[in-house]
């Protein structure tokens, strides 16, 4: 099965960087990689326990802004960190997906949140 990958922009309020994200309807919350945390050095805002493939681990949470391709406004997120990046640095979870129109049709993907256009 193919992965749904796209571009997102993450900001700490001072800097903004582009990252590759994967869309995961099985993930309850949006999370970011160590690379995002290292690049942007955001403020910590609590912690959470996350389940990875190998184990449950404690992860700090951070305050960041996420911008989606084709949208002019950003979304405030409070992501945890999933660890080392792979081919993507952001996992978009249902905390964001539930607010928009998620379409996967014959291999073509689109996602829109009308309020952020």
Predicted feature descriptions by range:
Residues 1-117:
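Pepsin/retropepsin-fold aspartyl endopeptidases
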């Amino acid at each position: 099965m193919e992965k749904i990958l796209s571009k997102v922009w993450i900001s700490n309020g001072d800097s903004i960087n582009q990252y590759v994200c994967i869309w995961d309807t099985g993930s309850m919350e949006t999370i970011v990689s160590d690379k995002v945390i290292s690049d942007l050095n955001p403020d910590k805002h609590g912690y959470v326990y996350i389940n990875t493939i190998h184990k449950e681990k404690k992860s700090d949470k951070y305050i960041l802004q996420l911008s989606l391709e084709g949208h002019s406004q950003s979304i405030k997120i409070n992501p945890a960190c999933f660890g080392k990046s792979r081919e993507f640095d952001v996992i978009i979870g249902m905390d964001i997906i539930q607010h928009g129109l998620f379409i996967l049709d014959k291999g073509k993907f689109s996602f829109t949140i009308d309020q952020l256009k």
